[in-house]
């Protein structure tokens, strides 16, 4: 309960900035509720006057006649009430929508700001889809709860309060009957909701399973056809849909009992009101108009009770979403940045001095590692999958800080440099080339927003991608789609090389050309990378040892440890792990 209160109280800190709109919305909603509640009473006055006139006429009284001026006043009040009700409802929603949308905007902006300041380790621990869900569906759930549930709660609470006040004002005995029906109606509705909720949750889970199954089968449709798995796939899908049908039936059957039960309680209340109310009308203690007002109030009382019951589930969902949002916001930021900035460009001299590192406490990954890299040198990092090649890059880029020792660039401890200034000195080209939705020109200019069109073309030529770009519809102005699927993987990598050239970094992080490209494109990528590495300190993640024989230094990693380092010739002469790797690749190549 404490966590729930904390989540909603933190939400109020966002809404508080727009408390004027929120207060106006609540005031106008209460106004519309009042106008709705007085409707039966106003109509009752008119009905009382009409029935009184009819009874006088039936008795043959000489003074019998319709008091038209009184009826006109009542009808005017009724129309005025209707106008106030509509205006109150409209502007209540208007002000609340305005406040909610601003609140959601602030929340998303804070999430975006937080994402830019949390350490990279957070992304290693959480799936991308989970984080995306917090940005989109969780924030949207909170938005819907604020915009719909909040005003519905206000409407339900004040409707109940005003209806109770009116029925007690009109007749205490009948009012107590109406009040007695409220807890019976509420707990009946809550009982049904509680019984049906697990089935609705199971229905949502099974629906998610079905969606995942369909997506998986559509994605791998060719493989499905190749291995003649259509029948088994259809049988599995049938099992899922059968489960969905059974659960859906139970959920809707139980929840479908709500209205008949609530209507039954209402009918019983109507019966009691009609019986005792009719007796009081005959006794002259209750007018016909007030009697019909009672009947309408019984009807008005059901809807807010049902809404409050259903809103409990919506608020629980909103609370869960708020918890997930604030979990991100409560993540610790990166270690506070320093104000020391680089006085000029780096030359690219890199030193690892007695470096220790561990992702998890008491589980060291790198111990007492030392390395000196001169400006312009090429350092290759090799090793089997999972050896820790990415760890060195993470340390160099300062995505993680060393546990002990230091990494210096041009004599500066990188922990004492502004991250922004430091990372601007780097260029990165990986196999998983990242391009965003936009034109090719915008993608190339990503690392240097001030680059001219001429500089963009020169960088593309140096990356051997200019000719390819000009063959595309629109050339440099061609729009990339969201997944960049309208160009191949190798072409993406050439574009990222051109982007790195345009940014003119002093230190490079490179991945070899993806093995899925054809030989001609692979040669173009290798040539473009050589152009990119000229005069720059380069760290190359190597997969095929035949491509790094010219490296000035080769680091050999195994099980997270740097077990060998040297150049190609010296490592072969040592006949260690590198020698075994090289010979195994060479043997496999010959066998092919």
Q: What are the functions of these language-model segments?
A:
Residues 23-88, 169-173, 284-288:
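Transmembrane helix-loop-helix hairpins at lipid-water interfaces of multipass membrane proteins
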């Amino acid at each position: 309960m404490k966590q729930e209160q904390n989540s909603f109280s933190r939400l109020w800190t966002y809404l508080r900035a727009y408390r004027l709109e929120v207060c106006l919305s609540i005031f106008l909603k209460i106004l519309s509720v009042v106008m709705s509640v007085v409707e039966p009473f106003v109509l009752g006055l008119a009905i009382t006057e009409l029935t009184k006139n009819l009874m006088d006429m039936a008795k043959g009284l000489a003074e019998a006649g319709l008091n038209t001026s009184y009826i006109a006043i009542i009808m005017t009040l009724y129309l005025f009430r209707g106008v106030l009700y509509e205006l109150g409802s409209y502007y209540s929603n208007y002000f609340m929508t305005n406040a909610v949308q601003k609140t959601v905007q602030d929340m998303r902006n804070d999430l975006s700001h937080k994402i830019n300041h949390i350490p990279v380790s957070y992304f290693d621990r959480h799936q991308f889809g989970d984080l995306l869900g917090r940005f989109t569906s969780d924030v949207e759930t909170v938005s819907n709860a604020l915009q719909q549930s909040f005003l519905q709660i206000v409407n339900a609470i004040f409707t109940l309060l005003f209806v109770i006040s009116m029925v007690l004002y009109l007749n205490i005995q009948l009012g107590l009957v109406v009040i007695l029906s409220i807890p019976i109606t509420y707990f009946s509705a809550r009982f049904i909701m509680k019984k049906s909720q697990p089935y609705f949750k199971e229905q949502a889970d099974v629906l998610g399973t079905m969606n995942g199954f369909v997506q998986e089968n559509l994605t791998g449709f060719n493989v499905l056809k190749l291995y003649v798995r259509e029948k088994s796939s259809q049988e599995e899908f049938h099992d899922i849909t059968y489960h969905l049908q059974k659960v859906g039936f139970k959920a809707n059957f139980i929840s479908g009992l709500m209205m008949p039960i609530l209507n039954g309680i209402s009918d019983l209340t109507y019966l009691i009101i009609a019986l005792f109310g009719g007796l009081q009308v005959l006794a002259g203690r209750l007018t016909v108009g007030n009697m019909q007002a009672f009947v309408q109030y019984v009807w008005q009382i059901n809807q807010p009770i049902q809404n409050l019951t259903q809103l409990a589930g919506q608020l629980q969902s909103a609370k869960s979403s708020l918890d997930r949002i604030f979990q991100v916001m409560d993540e610790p930021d990166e270690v506070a940045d320093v104000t020391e900035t680089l006085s000029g460009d780096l030359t690219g001299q890199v030193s690892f001095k007695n470096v220790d590192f561990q992702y998890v406490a008491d589980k060291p990954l790198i111990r007492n590692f030392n390395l000196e890299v001169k400006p312009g040198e090429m350092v290759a990092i090799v090793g089997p999958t999972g050896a820790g090649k990415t760890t060195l890059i993470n340390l160099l880029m300062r995505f993680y800080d060393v546990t002990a020792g230091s990494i210096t660039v041009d004599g500066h401890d990188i922990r004492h440099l502004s991250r922004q200034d430091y990372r601007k000195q780097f260029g990165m080209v990986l196999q998983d080339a990242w391009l965003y939705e936009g034109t090719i020109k915008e993608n190339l200019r990503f690392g240097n927003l001030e680059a001219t069109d001429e500089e963009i073309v020169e960088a593309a030529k140096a990356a051997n991608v200019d000719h390819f770009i000009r063959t595309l519809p629109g050339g440099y102005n061609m729009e990339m789609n969201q997944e960049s699927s309208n160009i191949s993987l190798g072409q993406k990598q050439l574009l990222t090389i051109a982007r790195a050239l345009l940014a003119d970094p002093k230190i490079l992080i490179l991945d070899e050309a993806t093995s899925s490209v054809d030989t001609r494109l692979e040669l173009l990528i290798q040539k473009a990378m050589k152009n990119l590495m000229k005069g720059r300190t380069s760290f190359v993640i190597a997969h095929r040892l035949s491509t790094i024989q010219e490296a000035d230094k080769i680091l050999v990693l195994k099980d997270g440890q740097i077990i060998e380092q040297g150049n190609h010739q010296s490592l072969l002469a040592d006949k260690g792990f590198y020698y075994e790797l090289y010979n195994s690749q060479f043997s496999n190549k010959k066998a092919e």
